[in-house]
């Protein structure tokens, strides 16, 4: 049996752009992608803390060090620049590996710079 587990997360990213006329996807600063091991074209879930919207899309690389978090295409209708989002990537993990799998979680500041790296979350934790 395989379980779908969170393996990477960018917590409280700030949307910097929303580009309706782009083909689709989410553009993420490549430094942030590397920090949590998300790769280009990988599927992610985006949760908007401001309006409760949830969507799935794929990732394209943004300029390193830019802090870019840009929702493209139809997804641009679900966010506004300045919105706080959580970007989550899941992976399939075998039953034997479930308790060995350690997620990479980057907590971001308002400029999308990493302020803390976590490997677990406690219930009721506020960041």
Curated annotation (Swiss-Prot):
Keywords: Autocatalytic cleavage, Cytoplasm, Decarboxylase, Lyase, Pantothenate biosynthesis, Pyruvate, Schiff base, Zymogen. One of its GO terms (molecular function) is aspartate 1-decarboxylase activity. It is an enzyme of class 4 (lyase). One of its GO terms (biological process) is alanine biosynthetic process. Pathway: Cofactor biosynthesis; (R)-pantothenate biosynthesis; beta-alanine from L-aspartate: step 1/1. Its EC number is 4.1.1.11. Its main location: cytoplasm. It catalyses: L-aspartate + H(+) = beta-alanine + CO2. Is synthesized initially as an inactive proenzyme, which is activated by self-cleavage at a specific serine bond to produce a beta-subunit with a hydroxyl group at its C-terminus and an alpha-subunit with a pyruvoyl group at its N-terminus. Gene3D superfamilies: 2.40.40.20. The active site is at residues 25, 58. Binds 1 pyruvoyl group covalently per subunit. The keyword Cytoplasm applies. It is found in: Cytoplasm. GO terms for cellular component: cytosol. InterPro entries: Asp_de-COase-like_dom_sf, Asp_decarbox. Substrate binds at residues 57, 73-75. CDD domains: Asp_decarbox. Belongs to the PanD family. Catalyzes the pyruvoyl-dependent decarboxylation of aspartate to produce beta-alanine. HAMAP family: PanD (MF_00446). Heterooctamer of four alpha and four beta subunits. NCBIfam families: panD. This is Aspartate 1-decarboxylase. The lineage of its organism: Bacteria, Bacillati, Bacillota, Bacilli, Bacillales.
């Amino acid at each position: 049996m395989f379980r779908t587990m969170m393996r990477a997360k960018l917590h409280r990213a700030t949307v910097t752009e929303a580009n309706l006329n782009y083909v689709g996807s989410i553009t993420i600063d490549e430094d942030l992608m590397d920090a949590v091991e998300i790769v280009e074209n990988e599927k992610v879930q985006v949760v908007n803390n401001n309006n409760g919207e949830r969507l799935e899309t794929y990732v394209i690389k943004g300029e390193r060090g830019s802090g870019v978090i840009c929702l493209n295409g139809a997804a641009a209708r679900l966010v506004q620049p300045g919105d706080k989002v959580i970007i989550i990537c899941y992976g399939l993990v075998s039953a034997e590996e479930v308790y060995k799998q350690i997620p990479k979680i980057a907590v971001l500041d308002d400029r999308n710079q990493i302020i803390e790296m976590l490997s677990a979350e406690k219930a009721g934790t506020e960041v």
